[in-house]
Amino acid sequence: MAKWWYGISAIIVCLDQATKMLANNYLVTEAINLLPILSLRLACNTGAAFSILEGASWLLIGVGVIFSAYFITQIWRLLSGSICEASAYTLILAGAIGNLIDRMAFGCVTDFVHFFYISNNDVYSFPIFNLADTAITLGAACWIYFMLFQENTNKSEGNKLN
């Protein structure tokens, strides 16, 4: 069963890398406004989420490798477990690998999705992100949900992979 989850993770990594390649090809000179609150704007992030640890590439590469190895192992060990748990591991793994590829190849992570809000000439901006960041966030939400609500009820409810 693990091979299916690895396959899904690989598809997400490929989509992440494809969108980053498109961003690097088409957003170099100017941003593209899609909606009044959404634009595609190229950014090179040398830090982690919200530019935390900016410039600490080797530390972030090490952390990315450790997290990737951990989630590869966790997926492999899931002979039976909840779909929520497997989804969490798969999404986090895909996001970690997607951003790790960028860090190792380019020294920074390509971000390009930008949500913002303009009110009374003030711009409220959410940090620019990418598909890998979205996968990590959704995976973390699934993992928290699993830890809080499903971990103890899996055996009785039959929400199993096998």
Give the positions of each predicted feature.
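Alpha-helical transmembrane bundles and membrane-interface segments of multipass inner-membrane proteins
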Residues: 1-162
